[in-house]
């Protein structure tokens, strides 16, 4: 299945373009799929570098100016960090059922990473030579969590919990604010539960620069982790070497394999869960059943009508 939009009764609706693969066409189709999301880095690198240099030279002044420009939020040194009062208010807005899910997920993630944890060890040879390794946790880590209109508690948990397990002393989370200068309650609750030491209402390349070089309000960290859009990815690439990073993550992708027994609604939900992340995201279904393909297409149209990130989904599926 490929992607595209169509008009019905004068209204644009999202559809997945369905391609039936035969032996004589599989080569060309697979080649096209590999080209579906070309490297667009060159178009953004100049702007990202400009932001980084401005924050590096002007600190908070540039940081808050870019936050207002890109996120529409007016912040100061006094309001950039999330307060305990804001976190308390967030808990009041999160349902108990969701809080239970966050805690269960957090526990599962912790158990997994505790099994990965490395330990120091030392040994002495017969001749008295000491061999070994000393494992020391980083002093500080900056966790980037996408935000704005959407909430990504999974990104919060999957980045903060491993840092806590490793023994990082200072975990600073950054996430873009809404226009009103607030962070989504679910994100705040997940951060508090996971153990973030500080939460700052900043995002984009300017947040990465602030974490890498430090400002009057944002402390410099030893490592920056977490996903983000192309600006965040390029910013992490640019500051790598001055500060450690986890990786340069590209746009979200998902490939779902399904036969005739698959539930079309579940398949559609899996595809859209990635398509809503980024305009450059790719969502692909490979199925042996034409009936399933058409049913998934119909489910996607139904889902999109009620999803708040409709515009992003439309662009990612275009």
Model-derived regions: residue spans:
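NAD(P)-dependent aldehyde/semialdehyde dehydrogenase
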Residues: 284-318
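Conserved small-residue-rich beta-alpha loop and adjacent elements
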Residues: 123-189
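Conserved NAD(P)+-binding/catalytic subdomain of aldehyde/semialdehyde dehydrogenases
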Residues: 195-282
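Short, Lys/Arg-enriched N-terminal segments with co-localized hydrophobic residues
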Residues: 1-15
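Short, solvent-exposed amphipathic alpha-helical segments in soluble enzyme
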Residues: 158-160, 188-190, 216, 240-242, ...
């Amino acid at each position: 299945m490929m992607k595209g939009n169509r008009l019905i009764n004068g209204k644009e609706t999202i559809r997945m373009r369905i391609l039936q693969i035969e032996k004589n066409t599989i080569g060309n189709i697979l080649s096209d799929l590999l080209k579906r999301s070309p490297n667009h880095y060159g178009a953004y690198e100049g702007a990202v570098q400009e932001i980084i240099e401005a924050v590096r030279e002007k600190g908070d002044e540039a940081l808050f100016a870019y936050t207002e420009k890109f996120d529409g939020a007016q912040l100061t040194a006094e309001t950039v960090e999330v307060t305990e009062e804001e976190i308390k208010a967030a808990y009041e807005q999160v349902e108990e059922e969701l809080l239970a899910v966050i805690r269960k997920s957090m526990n599962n993630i912790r158990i997994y990473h505790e099994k990965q944890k490395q330990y120091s060890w030392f040994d002495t040879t017969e001749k008295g030579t000491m061999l070994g390794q000393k494992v020391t946790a980083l002093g500080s880590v900056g966790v980037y969590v996408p935000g704005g209109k959407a909430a990504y508690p999974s990104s919060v948990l999957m980045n903060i919990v491993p840092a806590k397990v490793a023994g990082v002393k200072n975990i600073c989370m950054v996430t873009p604010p809404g226009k009103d200068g607030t962070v989504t309650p679910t994100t705040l609750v997940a951060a508090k539960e996971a153990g973030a030491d500080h939460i700052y209402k900043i995002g984009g390349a300017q947040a990465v620069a602030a974490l890498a070089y430090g400002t009057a309000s944002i402390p410099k960290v030893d490592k920056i982790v977490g996903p983000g859009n192309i600006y965040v990815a390029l910013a992490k690439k640019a500051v790598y070497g001055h500060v450690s990073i986890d990786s340069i993550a590209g746009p979200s992708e998902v490939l779902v394999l399904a036969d005739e027994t698959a539930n079309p609604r579940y398949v559609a939900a899996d595809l859209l869960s990635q398509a809503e992340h980024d305009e450059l995201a790719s969502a692909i279904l490979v199925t042996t059943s034409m009936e399933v393909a058409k049913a998934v297409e119909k489910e996607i149209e139904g889902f999109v009508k009620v999803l708040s990130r409709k515009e992003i989904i439309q662009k990612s599926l275009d």
